Amino acid sequence: MELTPREKDKLLLFTAALLAERRLARGLRLNYPEAVALISAAVLEGARDGRTVAELMSLGREVLVREQVMDGVPEMLHDVQVEATFPDGTKLVTVHDPIV
């Protein structure tokens, strides 16, 4: 199977998000890369489902709460930017202050 670099990036992101979901299910708090992966994957899947950029910006803020991440992660994570594919093309989705 031949994958483009972009496809490899998406697959790696999905794998990291899956790991983050499993750790959350075990009651563990997520670190910075895990939190970014989970939020990014939610945005990508939402775009695939046909949601709008505005909906995804809002959705990204609902994925995690402060109690689900390690101390200091919300303060380090100001924006998450994801390049998502929509029916009308690729767009950059920015989620501001995703963990409240």
From Swiss-Prot:
It comes from the Bacteria. HAMAP family: Urease_gamma (MF_00739). It comes from Pseudomonas entomophila (strain L48). It holds the Pfam family Urease_gamma. InterPro entries: Urease_gamma, Urease_gamma/gamma-beta_su, Urease_gamma_sf, Urease_subunit. GO terms for biological process: urea catabolic process. Its EC number is 3.5.1.5. The lineage of its organism: Bacteria, Pseudomonadati, Pseudomonadota, Gammaproteobacteria, Pseudomonadales. This is Urease subunit gamma. Heterotrimer of UreA (gamma), UreB (beta) and UreC (alpha) subunits. Three heterotrimers associate to form the active enzyme. Transmembrane segments: none annotated. GO terms for molecular function: nickel cation binding; urease activity. The keyword Hydrolase applies. It is found in: Cytoplasm. Belongs to the urease gamma subunit family. The gene is ureA. Pathway: Nitrogen metabolism; urea degradation; CO(2) and NH(3) from urea (urease route): step 1/1. GO terms for cellular component: cytoplasm. Keywords: Cytoplasm, Hydrolase. CDD domains: Urease_gamma. It catalyses: urea + 2 H2O + H(+) = hydrogencarbonate + 2 NH4(+).
